[in-house]
Amino acid sequence: MNSKAKGGRGEREWAAFCREHGFTDARRGTQFKGGYDSPDCVGLPMIHQEIKRVEKLNVHDAMRQSIRDCEGKAIPIVAHRRNREEWLVTMRAEDWMKIYKGWINDEQGRIYIP
């Protein structure tokens, strides 16, 4: 299987994973030019998704691509997995802290730990 076909398969797998978790609009993005308006997958609001389905990943290169392509308009992530492994998500620590702080606090200052 060539890398383009494997990439497309990974994008479909990630979109299906997102749909299984309640993001029913998740699907592959438009694959014609790169950039903010054409991430690998769409359907997670405010997240620019770079999807990698490879056995060996240079995570720093993949993050640089996601950061560059999101043009500062979304939180860049890299969702990646190897054969027979679970999905992992890589993101900048500053972005993770923003999301985590929002998750643990609501208007009354309660902490949510599901």
What are these regions (language model features)?
Residues 1-114:
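Catalytic phosphate/metal-binding cores of nucleic-acid and nucleotide-processing enzymes, i.e., regions
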